[in-house]
């Protein structure tokens, strides 16, 4: 494998990154979060925290990374299959960690689907702690129908 570089993701990377996302097994893309418009908003809020890995003049890895002022989150951590096991994910993660530290953030969370055996093995191997025994993950899609149901207590 030739050398690779890690750099901040920009919106100009979106089409190539999105294409990468669609080829990763054990990975979830949601139209509600992952449209170009949504990623523009995400990158504007977190301009230097997401990363892409470039090798052979193409994007072969990506981490969407952001924070809310309190803790950081990794989203869509991926490396193209033919480029795995060369330290790319680790280098991207460190790039994002340093960007979060520069922003005063001292904790990161991520979600890995339970069936994503390779991803889960990677995070355990590099020292991340699974909280699946004491934390439930909930989500609530913000739309008028759901908010009305919430208010009505349904």
Regions picked out by a protein language model, each given a short descriptive name:
Residues 110-120, 141:
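Conserved beta-strand-loop-alpha-helix junction that forms the acyl-donor binding cleft
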């Amino acid at each position: 494998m030739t050398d690779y570089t890690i750099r901040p993701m920009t919106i100009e990377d979106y089409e190539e990154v999105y294409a990468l996302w669609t080829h990763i097994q054990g990975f979830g893309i949601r139209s509600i979060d992952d449209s170009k418009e949504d990623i523009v908003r995400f990158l504007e809020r977190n301009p230097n925290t997401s990363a892409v890995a470039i090798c052979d003049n193409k994007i072969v890895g990506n981490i969407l990374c952001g924070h809310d002022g309190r803790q950081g989150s990794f989203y869509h951590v991926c490396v193209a299959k033919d480029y795995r096991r060369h330290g790319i994910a680790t280098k991207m993660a460190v790039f994002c960690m340093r960007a979060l530290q520069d922003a005063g953030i001292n904790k990161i969370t991520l979600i890995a689907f339970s069936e994503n055996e390779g991803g889960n093995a990677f995070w355990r191997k590099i020292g991340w702690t699974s909280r699946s025994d004491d934390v439930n993950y909930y989500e609530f899609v913000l739309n008028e129908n759901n908010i009305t149901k919430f208010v009505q207590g349904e």
